[in-house]
């Protein structure tokens, strides 16, 4: 959002601040300044001149010979191509050696030259040639009272434009008024003059058919307006923030949006059937918007219709061409309204149509600014376009009372680490429009201004106190510091990091009670930890496994209609040590571990006409576990082994102090029938339980980046006959370690058959081979394949299958 400092002074006449200090101040208030644009400083060799004489160019019909007084002894002879140049005009003149910078970045240095055979000693400038606007219709005409020969730059108002990043929760500062409030420090703001209007009930002239989409709507009919170019001051205001002026009516509505933050729209009354307005959200039609593009409006999108039902505007987003103000317009209907944020956002997103209006309505506008902005705009229209007000109407209502919130000074100081008094907090908040309506030693009661739609709870008030007091002014406090155990490395707290990874895999977290029933716990272990003083029956032992609690949740969800579930929990489990009697040494009588349990059950996909209703199986679970291990950079040093006839174990290899050891990370299995029956579950459930501490030990926070080879990558397929008992994983690891040029090894086929010598198993591998330094030759590739063959035969007894 762009903010002009000179425009800001309309609200704060005495505001003065160096640009660097202002940027720093806004940053500490929570508004990042992304860019600073200073008005271009014109070359002082561009001066004010007066055209003394003009005559047609003898060799060109469209050129004029001008004699121009620039305050020197002799006037300058200048060739000009502008159609509006005439004797007596006061104009900006670029004299010899003056430098002009055009909007496209190109520069021009003025020097004496001949144009179609006639000498020219300078250049009479148009506005776009000076970087003041995009107008190239003719040379600029200056005030006749300006001193001839004086640098033109001395008559220009210098300005600084800030490009401010506003967070989505602060729509109140999406205007010059909003920024002025933040910078005022309690000083009174100077508002633009308003027309005295009395808004009468609209009756049938304004109908709101969807009060949710539009709770409040005002309209003012003005007769006899004259559509013309806006005055220079208004054009400059809009140009400073990057807008192109259109005409006085449209420019005023744009001015109101950026000055006060209230989007407005003007309709041509002659193009509104019956001069009536209806706000609806049940239309299905096409509409041509002001950008000359056609949009298909669907049900649920709020629109503005006229008396015939034709769409005149997309509510809160953009007006329609059918009712647009043009040069022939004489009567206008001025809209100022309140539209529902989420409905405007949904409409703008579906139509892929964003505008300055939708940007503000999506975030929330000040409900009490609707009438104020309307009255201000009417005053400007009467001043700049003439006409008379026929009527001012309203339909709907806004909340009469402001929201009240309590702030406890003691809690505020405790959270912020400050020692502010209640009076100081009142002074800070009243600077930006809050009003203290009741004050006691325990709490302060504030009326929240209508423009602060983001302040809904006490913590929001506390945040405002911190922001206004200054985060940099809050002293560091050791008591406020959070100290994590020294063994924690990046990420700061591994279980939370693990939770985030599982959520990205589509699992939902559950939290279950660590105290469970004895008969539930007995399914998982016989070494139970009894609670000496249970709070109730059914909560007498600590859980030895996370699985009972998880199955209880699954059973509950199934009974309530949710059969498709992907759940996880990260929590502690407890198991008794049989050699220690718990009654004598309770703290030493058990061991505690942090575990992760994952479970899936139900359909693989949502039930759709184009999807089979396949149920999840063991491979869905193992795939999710593999993806988790890959996210943690553990997959390449893990292996899956047979644990029991119905379960697989996940083992990982750790190399510590030069010695490689194998550790059991956890198991994956279908939940057995006895457990399912115990928890009244009649569908298959697949689960995995992993050791969180071991996951953290194995976790590699970063992966070394290896740039892709600039040389061609070679792919080869190779098939082995492997002896019974040799796993495919061991074959993959052996092939991978045979040569560093082998980048990937994947299994793409497995085949078994009965042979004379017994069962024969064939494993087919796909290899990717790449060299970062050179193109691989056939000889080198054949050597790599030969090495693989020798290693496989000597170490695993695997031989290449002959076709």
UniProtKB/Swiss-Prot annotation:
Catalytic activity: tRNA(Phe) + L-phenylalanine + ATP = L-phenylalanyl-tRNA(Phe) + AMP + diphosphate + H(+)
Any GO molecular function: magnesium ion binding
Superkingdom of origin organism: Bacteria
Record domain tRNA-binding: where: 40-153
GO biological process: phenylalanyl-tRNA aminoacylation
B5 domain sequence ranges: 400-476
Positions of the FDX-ACB domain: 709-801
UniProt key word Ligase: yes
EC number(s) on file: 6.1.1.20
Subunit: Tetramer of two alpha and two beta subunits.
Name of this chain's protein: Phenylalanine--tRNA ligase beta subunit
Gene: pheT
